[in-house]
Amino acid sequence: MELTPREKDKLLIFTAALLAERRRARGLKLNYPEAVALISAAVMEGARDGKTVAQLMSEGRTVLGRADVMDGIAEMIPDIQVEATFPDGTKLVTVHQPIV
């Protein structure tokens, strides 16, 4: 199977998000890469479902709360930018203050 670098990146994010979901389900607090992956994957899947950029910017802030991440992680992530594929093309989605 031949994948483009972009497709490889998407698969890596999805895999990290899957791991983060499992750890979160076990009651573990997420670290920086796990938190970023989980929020990024939620944005990418929302785009694939046909949601708008504005909806995803808003929904991206509800994926995780401070109680879901290790101490100091929320402050380490002022915003997350995700290049997501929408029905009408690829767009950059920025989620400001993703962990509140």
Swiss-Prot record:
It is found in: Cytoplasm. It holds the Pfam family Urease_gamma. GO terms for cellular component: cytoplasm. Its main location: cytoplasm. It catalyses: urea + 2 H2O + H(+) = hydrogencarbonate + 2 NH4(+). Keywords: Cytoplasm, Hydrolase. Disulfide bonds: none annotated. The keyword Hydrolase applies. One of its GO terms (molecular function) is urease activity. Its EC number is 3.5.1.5. CDD domains: Urease_gamma. GO terms for biological process: urea catabolic process. Belongs to the urease gamma subunit family. NCBIfam families: PRK13241.1, urease_gam. This is Urease subunit gamma.
